[in-house]
Design a protein with these regions (language model features):
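A short, well-structured juxtamembrane/interface segment
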Residues: 1-4
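S-adenosylmethionine/decaboxylated-SAM
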Residues: 6, 10-182
Length: 182
């Protein structure tokens, strides 16, 4: 993620980053650290309920809701303030986009969106909200694409794979990257 942040920030300086499904802040810390090294002023929006998985539904074979609730906003804030020391972040506590999207300025453009929500409906809602706010060349990273417990996310990515305005690739770590072409 650090290299991806560097590449996108180089092409689109100042483009914001959105992470939905922050859990304990590990990926947020990596991205913030990279932005700090780059002396960027991009805003990182970190959206999480801090109460576990939300919107689990019939397209998800493993999750029923509430899993991964062993976190808190304070854990994430401590990590960002003491480890990455990157000041330009905003925590959006609640279900995104339903409860917290209004906290993002309407003209904000994103270079990266990291979706780590584990379930179909939540991932779809985030993708549909962010796509028109993504810069050309921007990337949506689906953290859970290749995991047997996240079949809903795999299904979602496959549904969007052949749209002409994007390219989808995946790696051996289970991530899918959806790159906006136009």
């Amino acid at each position: 993620m650090g290299r991806l942040v560097g590449k996108v920030n180089n092409e689109h300086p100042g483009a914001a980053i959105l992470e939905v499904g922050v859990w304990r802040g590990g990926t947020a810390g990596i991205m913030a650290q990279q932005l700090s090294v780059l002396k960027s002023n991009a805003t990182i929006y970190l959206a999480d309920t801090f109460t576990g998985v939300a919107k689990a539904g019939e397209k998800d074979n493993f999750y029923s809701g509430g899993e991964h609730n062993d976190t808190s906003q304070q854990i994430v804030e401590d990590l960002l303030q003491h480890k990455s020391q990157y000041p330009n972040y905003k925590i959006l506590k609640g279900i995104f986009p339903d409860e917290t999207a209004h906290l993002v300025p309407p003209n904000e453009m994103f270079g990266i969106c990291h979706i780590d929500v584990d379930v179909y409906d939540s991932a779809k809602d985030v993708l549909e909200w962010v796509w028109n706010k993504l810069v050309t060349g921007g990337v949506v990273v689906f953290d859970d694409y290749g995991f047997h417990s996240c079949t809903g996310v795999t299904r979602l990515v496959e549904e969007y794979r052949n749209y002409p305005d994007r390219m989808v690739i995946h790696n051996l770590n289970g991530h899918a990257l959806m790159i906006k072409l136009k």
